């Protein structure tokens, strides 16, 4: 059976639409994580500039990220139980998110290791997430998200040249990165999902 060019394009478009629909429904997770990261960044920044337990300000990240992880895991387990009857395909982008997340967890330890560098941790945390989001943005042909990812790459490398006295602003830059990588597409997915829901 020979496929015509138009048939091939239809198949490709249907795969892209399935992926978009999956993430539109999960647009909640992108928004949830972006808000959580932005909140952690702003809280740590406020603790640092007001000198309110500055050495313990990193625990804000530990607490909020752990809560976010367990909440996400709980939601994922609940949704998996509901979809158990359906045959679900194994999405390779889920594995990319998983690897980037594990990488971020390990990178939290860098400032307390022999590297002793928050800038290195920032690079190691956000670079994989930026690659994952850019991969998805290119696959889904979402121009706004592609631009946000490219801007994130520029910020990641620009941050490496910040002088040590300016590291106090890294939590705010983390908030900006969360907005670029997660909040923008999350809102876009949510709006697309609402449009589709109203049309049906």
Spans of features found by a protein language model:
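Membrane-proximal helix-loop-helix units in multi-pass membrane proteins
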Residues: 89-150
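Terminal transmembrane helical module of multi-pass membrane proteins
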Residues: 132-200
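Amphipathic, well-ordered alpha-helical segments in soluble domains
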Residues: 8, 38-41, 179
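Structural signature of hydrophobic alpha-helical transmembrane segments
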Residues: 56-67, 112-127, 172, 176
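N-terminal juxtamembrane cytosolic/stromal segments of multi-pass membrane proteins
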Residues: 1-27
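Membrane-interface helix-boundary signature
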Residues: 19, 23-26, 51-54, 115, ...
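Selected alpha-helical membrane-embedding segments in polytopic membrane proteins
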Residues: 21-109
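Short helix-capping/hinge motifs at transmembrane helix termini and TM-loop junctions
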Residues: 47-51, 114-115, 140, 162-164
């Amino acid at each position: 059976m020979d496929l015509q060019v138009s048939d091939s394009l239809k198949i490709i478009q249907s795969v892209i639409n399935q992926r978009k629909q999956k993430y539109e429904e999960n647009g909640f997770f992108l928004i949830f994580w972006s808000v959580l990261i932005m909140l952690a960044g702003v809280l740590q920044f406020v603790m640092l500039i007001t000198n309110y337990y500055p050495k313990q300000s990193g625990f804000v990240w530990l607490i909020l990220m752990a809560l976010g992880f367990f909440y996400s895991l709980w939601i994922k387990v609940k949704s998996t139980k509901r979809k158990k009857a359906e045959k679900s395909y194994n999405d390779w982008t889920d594995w990319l998110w998983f690897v980037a997340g594990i990488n971020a967890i390990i990178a939290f330890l860098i400032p307390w290791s022999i590297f002793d560098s928050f800038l290195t941790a920032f690079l190691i945390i956000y670079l994989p997430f930026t690659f994952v989001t850019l991969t998805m943005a290119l696959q889904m042909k979402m121009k706004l998200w592609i631009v946000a990812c490219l801007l994130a790459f520029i910020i990641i490398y620009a941050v490496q040249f910040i002088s040590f006295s300016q590291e106090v602003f890294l939590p705010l830059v983390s908030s900006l990165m969360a907005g670029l990588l997660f909040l923008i597409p999350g809102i876009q997915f949510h709006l697309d999902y609402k449009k589709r829901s109203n049309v049906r």
